[in-house]
Amino acid sequence: MVSTTTFLMLTSLATLTSARSHLTVTIGSNCTLKGPQGGHVFWWRIYDNGWFTKPCDQPGRFFCNGRDLTIINVTANDKGFYYGTDYKSSLDYNIIVLPSTTPPPRTTTFSSSSVANNTISNPTFAALLKRTVNNSTTSHTTISTSTISIIAAVTIGISILVFTITYYACCYRKDKHKGDPLLRFDI
């Protein structure tokens, strides 16, 4: 029962791919994954074939300080999905490993100091800001990823339950002569 619950939990977590943070790391470097700000964080590594491990149980390869997970000397085998939770909140990472000869992807950083160099006129900027605010409000017609993951977990649970009941009904069907005498209504 515990393995089924764990499987359902990790299956529902796997459906949350759109909320996953993608990190690109080069081979030989160290990578620190920040955990939720709550209490003690439990980390899981989820493989493509459905297996999962606790990286904090592997000293020397990983370093856990109770909240963050550091992957020491990243190798090509460290690519994959890492999930950290304190059972109140969670963070999900997808680690992409590049060879050390490949330059890291170019990142662009925006800062608040760029507002002084604004070339957009005030009315245009106000219209653009209004349009952005109107478009960024959440629509009531979209379904959040957490709702989809809960629905997926419930569907899998119900299908396992139906399969178990069907299996029991087909394989353990009692004959007429083997029935419980208290449940027979023969008079």
UniProtKB/Swiss-Prot annotation:
Q: Which domain of life is it from?
A: Viruses
Keywords, A to Z? Early protein, Glycoprotein
- The cysteines joined by S-S bonds are none
**Where in the sequence does glycosylation occur per the annotation?**
30, 73, 117, 134-135
Tell me yes or no: is RNA-binding among this UniProt entry's keywords: no
The similarity comment for this entry is: Belongs to the adenoviridae E3_20 family.
Q: What is this protein called?
A: Early E3 20.6 kDa glycoprotein
Which organism does this record belong to? Human adenovirus B serotype 35 (HAdV-35)
Please name the taxonomic classification of the source: Viruses, Varidnaviria, Bamfordvirae, Preplasmiviricota, Tectiliviricetes
